Amino acid sequence: MLIKTVFAGFGGQGVLSMGLNLAQAAMIEGKHVTFMPSYGVEVRGGTANCTVAISTEDIASPVASSPEFLVVMSQPSLARFQNQVESGGVLFYNSSLVTADIPRGDIELLAVPATRMAEEMDSPRSANMVMLGAFIKKTNLVSMDTIFETLKETFKTKTKLIAVNKKALMAGYDLALPKRQGDASVRTSSG
C-alpha cells in the first residue's frame, strides 16, 4: 500500500501542520512515511503545500504527480492541484472558502466547511484541524488516538491549544461520519 496526499492552501492556514501531524501519526503507527513541504515566496498569505506519502513498504519517491487524496484550503490551491488527483481519488475542500465546480466525474468531492466550523467554535485558526479530522475519518490512514498523541507533542509548550485542536479534529471527524450519497457534506463530482 502506497498512499500519497497533497495538502494545499495559503500560508498561515496550517496546511503544513496538517501534513506533518499526519506524517508523525503514521510513523508512530510503524508505517513508512515521507513529508515534503513546499513554501511560496512569503509564508503567511503566500502559497504552501506539502506531500505526505504513507506506505507499508519503503517509499521510492516522495513526489506525488497523481495523489490519491487532495486537501485544499484555498481557491488558488484547487485551481493548481485539482487535475492531479488520481482517478477514483478524493478531493477534500474547505467549502467555506472554496467553490468546487469540477467537471471531472471520476473523483469524489468532500465539502468540509472547515473555516465556518472553526469560527463557530471561537477558534478560527483551527480550521486545518477540522479538515484533518474529516480527512482521517474518510481515509482511515491513521487512528484519531494517534493524531491526539501528535497534538501533545506539537503543543507541548502550549498545552491549552491541545484541547482546542482536539475539539476541532473531532468536529471534522463527526462531520464526515455519514458517507451516503446525497448527504449535505459528501457528494461526488458527477452529482
Annotated model-derived regions:
Residues 1-191:
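Active-site cofactor/cluster-binding pocket
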